């Protein structure tokens, strides 16, 4: 039997015969544990998922550990504010994010820069444009109202997901927790 280490907060979602979506979850592990209480539920995971009866089923008598794939996270060295936000990564590191991924930014001591679950619209890894060798990505997030200067100490960008659940007919709850499996 595998040992599970919980990571982050445990979310609960009320389930019914229509799809219900969680808040954004900043991905910190490669697995999520789903527990269906009272009624089994179908689960979809993604950027903005809608659960259908064709999706993964979690029984009310057993939990499920679902793989999220590799954790996507990267240190941020600069943020260019505007109608779209441009994020610069450290030189030589590249981007673990692709166009269409949802991401969340955390900047310690400068929360006006923080955003949650915004979509990557472009990835630019062109080297030596004006002596610039870093990878840049563009995010569909309007940061033009941010007035604080950017201090990159500890700033990080993380892939984020949402979990959608639904039952066939009965109501219940689903508990969602990121876990490390060993």
Task: Report each predicted region and the residues it spans.
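Short, surface-exposed beta-strand/strand-loop-strand elements in extracellular ectodomains
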Residues: 37-55, 177
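Short, intrinsically disordered N-terminal pre-domain segments
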Residues: 1-22, 144, 169-182
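Intrinsically disordered, low-complexity Pro/Gly/Ser/Thr-rich segments with frequent PxxP/GP/PP motifs
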Residues: 11-12, 51-71
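Asparagine-centered strand-capping/turn motif at beta-strand->loop junctions
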Residues: 32-38, 165-167
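Surface-exposed ligand/attachment interfaces on beta-rich extracellular proteins
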Residues: 9-28, 49-52, 81-94, 110-111
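Small/polar beta-strand repeat architecture
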Residues: 70-182
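Short, solvent-exposed coil/turn segments at beta-strand boundaries
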Residues: 27-30, 101
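Repetitive beta-strand solenoid architecture
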Residues: 7, 28, 37-39, 62, ...
């Amino acid at each position: 039997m595998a040992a599970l280490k919980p990571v982050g907060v445990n979310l609960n979602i009320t389930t019914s015969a229509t799809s219900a979506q969680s808040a954004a979850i900043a991905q910190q592990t490669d697995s999520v544990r789903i527990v269906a209480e009272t009624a089994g539920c179908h689960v979809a995971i993604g950027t903005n998922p809608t659960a259908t009866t064709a999706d993964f089923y979690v029984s009310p008598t057993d939990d499920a550990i679902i793989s999220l794939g590799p954790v996507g996270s990267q240190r941020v060295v600069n943020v260019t504010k505007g109608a779209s936000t441009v994020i610069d990564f450290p030189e030589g590191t590249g981007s673990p994010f692709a166009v269409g991924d949802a991401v969340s930014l955390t900047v310690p001591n400068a929360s006006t820069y923080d955003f949650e679950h915004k979509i990557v619209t472009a990835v630019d890894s062109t080297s030596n444009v004006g002596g610039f060798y870093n990878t840049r990505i563009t995010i569909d997030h309007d940061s033009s109202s941010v007035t604080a200067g950017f201090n990159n100490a500890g700033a990080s960008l993380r892939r984020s997901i949402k979990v959608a659940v639904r039952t066939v007919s009965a109501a219940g709850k689903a508990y969602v927790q990121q876990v490390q499996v060993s």
